[in-house]
Amino acid sequence: GLVDVLGKVGGLIKKLLPG
């Protein structure tokens, strides 16, 4: 679902970007 995709993308962003 969209929520799952957003969660995965958010996790990747948090890993790539500090804070």
From Swiss-Prot:
Primary location recorded for the protein, binned into one broad class: secreted
Gene Ontology terms: cellular component: extracellular region
Protein name, UniProt field: U1-poneritoxin-Ng3g
Biological processes annotated in GO: defense response to bacterium; defense response to fungus; killing of cells of another organism
Ranges in a coiled coil: none
Function: Has activity against Gram-positive bacteria and S.cerevisiae. Has non-hemolytic activity.
Keywords per UniProt: Antibiotic, Antimicrobial, Fungicide, Secreted
Keyword Secreted found: yes
Cysteine-cysteine disulfides: none
Family indicated by similarity: Belongs to the ponericin-G family.
Species, as recorded: Neoponera goeldii (Ponerine ant)
Tissue: Expressed by the venom gland.
Location of this chain's protein in the cell: Secreted
Protein origin, superkingdom: Eukaryota
